[in-house]
Design a protein with these regions (language model features):
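A general structural detector for well-ordered alpha-helical segments in enzyme core domains, enriched
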Residues: 56, 60, 84-89, 115, ...
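Binuclear metal-dependent phosphoesterase catalytic core
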Residues: 6-9, 24-26, 31-34, 117, ...
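Conserved catalytic scaffold of divalent metal-dependent phosphoesterases
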Residues: 43-45, 113-209, 253-254, 272
Length: 289
């Protein structure tokens, strides 16, 4: 399901189950649900933009079960910007699950811990190498990092500063792999800020491609049965692409969504099946073993 009739359709759709071709009555079967996931990135909340998305957040909560925020949610990484966001999104956070990853802008002012605390205090789940589950769907999230794509991905060669840069990209990839490995759900969703493939940054100047994402992030996505990937960062990129194994990737940068779907709500909505919920291993549980 995409944008067309999004307000008219119901959120949850029980389906009839069969075993060996024999229908099972709903009272005797595990009822599967379709979960609607909305995603957007690069809101860049700052002084003067408060109130801009309040109506949109309300509309999203009317038609989606879960909202993903894929980084650069605020502009300069200031706590006051986070408070403006929470003022607009607080009612939505009471109605539906909101899951987020940070982007590069959240780090600009060196107050990222305070920003995270404000967002978490307002009911937003922040993922940074962790896994979580909501309504039977699994989510793995990291910020990601630059580094380039394909055969031109930056290698750890030469100056120590280059090696540290590549190490950061590798670490983000390993964090994503660890998070995906913890999930035991029918559907898995990966949310990032930086792009895992080149296809969804097409449209940006070629000179900045290495700073828009890194194909090292694609490796763990291909290794696990991921239903979809969402990212942002490339405001002038391409909305949709696929990994080398065919997994759909959506660039949900706000500016790109507004250009791709003019007059529509500022989000991309997909539907995924929800299986019986099984708890994901948390980072704390892993550390305690």
């Amino acid at each position: 399901m995409y944008h067309g009739d999004w307000l008219q359709r119901r959120k949850v759709h029980p389906s009839r189950r069969e075993i060996h071709g024999i229908p099972i009555a709903q009272s005797e079967a595990v009822i599967e649900r379709t979960i609607r996931i909305a995603a957007v990135a690069d809101l860049h909340y700052r002084t003067g933009t408060d109130g801009r998305f309040r109506t949109a957040f309300t509309e999203i909560s009317d038609c989606a079960d879960i909202l993903l925020l894929c980084g650069d949610i605020i502009d300069y990484g200031l706590p006051d910007e986070a408070r403006l966001l929470m003022k607009d999104i607080s009612e939505t956070a009471k109605r539906i699950t909101i899951i987020a990853v940070l982007g590069n802008h959240e780090y600009e002012s060196g107050k990222v811990d305070e920003v995270i605390a404000i967002m978490k205090g307002g009911g937003i789940t922040i993922l940074d190498g962790e896994a979580c589950e909501a309504q039977g769907v699994g989510f793995a999230g990291v910020k990601g990092f630059p580094g380039g794509f394909g055969a031109r991905v930056l290698a750890p060669w030469g100056e120590p500063s280059i090696k540290r840069f590549v190490h950061e990209a590798v670490e983000e990839s390993l964090k994503l792999e660890s998070a995906l490995a913890r999930l035991r759900t029918t559907s898995r969703i990966a949310l990032l800020h930086y792009a895992p493939i080149a296809a969804t940054v097409m449209g940006e100047p070629l000179e900045i491609f290495p700073f828009l994402g890194c194909s090292r992030l694609e490796e763990p996505i291909n290794r696990y049965p991921v239903a979809a990937v969402f990212h942002g960062h490339a405001h002038n990129g391409t909305h949709e692409g696929k990994t080398s194994s065919g997994i759909p990737v959506y660039n949900v940068a706000l500016k790109l969504l507004e250009k791709t779907f003019p007059g529509k709500p500022p989000c991309r909505i997909i539907e995924v099946p929800s299986g019986p919920e099984q708890r994901a291993e948390t980072a704390q549980a892993q550390a305690g073993r």
